[in-house]
A protein has these predicted regions:
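N-terminal Rossmann-like FAD-binding beta1-loop-alpha1 element of flavoenzymes
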Residues: 9-35
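C-terminal catalytic lobe of FAD-dependent flavoproteins
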Residues: 159, 296-374
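Conserved Rossmann-like nucleotide-cofactor binding loop
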Residues: 19, 42, 215
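Active-site substrate-recognition segment that forms the wall
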Residues: 25-30, 39, 52-54, 90-95, ...
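Helical element adjacent to the flavin cofactor pocket in flavoenzyme catalytic cores
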Residues: 149-207
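Dinucleotide-binding Rossmann-like beta1-alpha1 core, especially the glycine-rich loop
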Residues: 52-133, 137, 291-293
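Helix-loop-beta segment of a Rossmann-like dinucleotide-binding subdomain
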Residues: 90-103, 115-116, 127-173, 270-274, ...
């Protein structure tokens, strides 16, 4: 059993976003004394800026372990949402509203169905919607679409509310959050992580977890190569209507629309490698708004509530880094790119298992050994 210290904290988690906060909750529930260090405000970065799509099926174009993890994590949200309502009285906006991906031509619709057909053989729902039915189901969509493929078990959550609820639950369970704290390095002595160095000294702990998102590779000693996890800027536009224009999350060529029950619609997104430049750009907005009005021309009359951008932790091989970092008592939980909200429940369970029991699946596509460096 690892992750216990005779004094101070058993676990220090670097990063107070969704990954760090949910890992803190699970470890605190297991009796660990947990400190979460966040350079800004917990949840202020990519976690709260995400659209919150639970695309366990719709983002999976091929079979394999990553698909299985995605569906597992999506299904964990059923219990997680109920747990948070009970623990802190907050509805995190979990809705199994489904995702539909539209096709512009019959040929594209056939190809889209072939892309997802393998999921049916694994027992998952995949539905083909012809043009006439699509106009009845989602009348606001462009009437020129040839149809769509529906993944009715995918859904959404509201990320800012989710992060707030999890942080509150973690604090009630005994975890400590410290905002405005930049971690410079992991303190390693004789091949064992002993804590972290911050701007005003050191913090000792029995175990260190790196969950700093796009900033993870900047923590010295975290064993994460700069090429393994890097920032990918994503811009989002939030529209406002009197009523939701769609029942489901809608994917189209080059973008998506996420309808909230209160009439807000989150539209995205861009993928830009510009370092940590957080600007919202004319080009980015033009791309998003062009895509969204192509999906539903009536949205051209919607009010623009706000725009923002943030940085997803992009992993160049498409898989996160979760588990054993190759140094004793050091765990990684980063590199989830745009699936961080979806994959947080599965990640937190694996972090808990590694910290408490030392377990990391050597065959997992998330095993950090493929991408870490000393």
């Amino acid at each position: 059993m690892s992750g216990q210290s005779s004094g101070g904290f058993d676990v220090v988690i670097v990063g107070g976003g969704l990954m760090g906060s949910l890992s803190a909750l699970r470890l605190a529930d297991a009796g660990r004394r947990v400190l979460v260090l966040e350079k800004a405000v917990p949840g202020a970065e990519a976690s709260s800026a995400a659209a919150g799509i639970l695309a366990g099926q719709s983002e999976s174009k091929s079979d394999g372990p990553l698909f299985d993890i995605s569906v597992e994590s999506r299904e964990r949200y059923v219990a997680l949402a109920a747990e948070l309502r009970e623990r802190v009285g907050i509805d995190v906006g979990f809705r199994r509203c489904g995702v539909i991906e539209v096709a512009e031509t019959e040929q594209a619709l056939d190809e889209l169905e072939r892309t997802f057909a393998w999921q049916r053989t694994k027992g998952h729902r995949v539905e083909r919607i012809e043009a006439s039915a699509l106009r009845s189901i989602e009348p606001q969509l462009n009437p020129g679409f040839a149809g769509a493929i529906a993944l009715p078990d995918d859904g959404q959550v509201d990320p800012p509310t989710l992060v707030t609820a999890i942080a509150q639950a973690a604090e009630r369970a005994g975890a400590t959050f410290r905002a405005g704290t930049t971690v410079r390095s992991v303190l390693v002595e004789n091949g064992v992580a002993r804590g972290v160095e911050v701007e005003d000294g050191r913090i000792d702990a029995g175990h260190v977890v790196i969950a700093a998102g796009a900033w993870s590779s900047l923590v010295q000693g975290a064993t994460i190569a700069s090429s393994a996890v890097k920032p990918a800027r994503g811009q989002i536009v939030e529209l406002s209507l009197r009523t939701p224009p769609f029942k489901s999350v809608v994917f189209g060529r080059g973008g998506y629309a996420v309808p909230r029950p209160d009439g807000r619609v989150l539209c995205g997104s861009t993928l830009e490698f510009v370092g940590f430049q957080k600007d919202v750009t004319v080009g980015g907005l033009a791309k998003i708004l062009g895509t969204i009005t192509g999906l539903a021309p009536s949205l051209a009359d919607a009010k623009v509530n706000r725009t923002w951008s943030n940085f997803r932790p992009f992993s160049s091989d498409g898989a996160a880094l979760v588990g054993d970092a190759g140094i004793a008592n050091l765990t990684l939980a980063t590199g989830h790119h745009r699936s961080g909200i979806l994959l947080a429940p599965a990640t937190a369970e694996r972090v808990r298992a590694h910290v408490i029991d030392g377990r990391t699946d050597a065959n997992s596509p998330w095993n950090p050994s493929r991408r870490t460096s000393s």
